């Protein structure tokens, strides 16, 4: 992605409420399992835009064993996923309007759009947002299997 386009994408993402934004070159996904690769969705992909929204610390720290029908403090996750979905859609539309192919990916989706090569399963994640965050330079893969960022740590 050229520098002007990178700046425009990041500017839009931050304006829409992203806390972190990174852009990964598709080569960073070269050895990723096909179920976690952007090439499984858009074989001609060259870059992957990754946005993150910070979870309020208290919503994570105060959540715990509660009644199974109570959502508790972590229910903020629904709002955050919606925010990430809007970010994905609007960035995808911007890229589409500029003549690029873009496939906005839902923040918590488990359905594929189509099979890919020898993988015909449709009940699988579109790709790993965790790996995408690492590939885009937002953080490192932690022992907990999550993308650990310098700004927000392992909380």
Regions found by a protein language model. Give the residues of each.
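Non-catalytic, usually N-terminal nucleic-acid engagement modules in DNA/RNA processing proteins
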Residues: 1-89
């Amino acid at each position: 992605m050229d520098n002007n386009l990178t700046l425009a994408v990041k500017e839009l993402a931050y304006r829409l409420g992203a806390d972190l934004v990174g852009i990964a070159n598709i080569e960073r996904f070269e050895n990723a399992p096909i179920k976690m690769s952007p090439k499984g969705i858009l074989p001609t992909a060259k870059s992957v835009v990754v946005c993150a929204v910070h979870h309020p610390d208290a919503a994570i720290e105060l959540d715990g064993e509660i009644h199974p029908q109570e959502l508790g403090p972590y229910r903020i996750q629904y709002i955050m996923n919606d925010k990430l979905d809007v970010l994905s859609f609007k960035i995808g539309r911007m890229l589409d309007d500029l003549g690029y192919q873009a496939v906005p990916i839902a923040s918590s989706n488990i359905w594929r759009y189509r099979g890919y090569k020898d993988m015909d399963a449709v009940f699988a994640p579109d790709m790993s947002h965790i790996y995408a965050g690492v590939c885009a330079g937002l953080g490192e893969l932690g022992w907990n299997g999550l993308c650990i960022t310098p700004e927000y740590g392992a909380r």
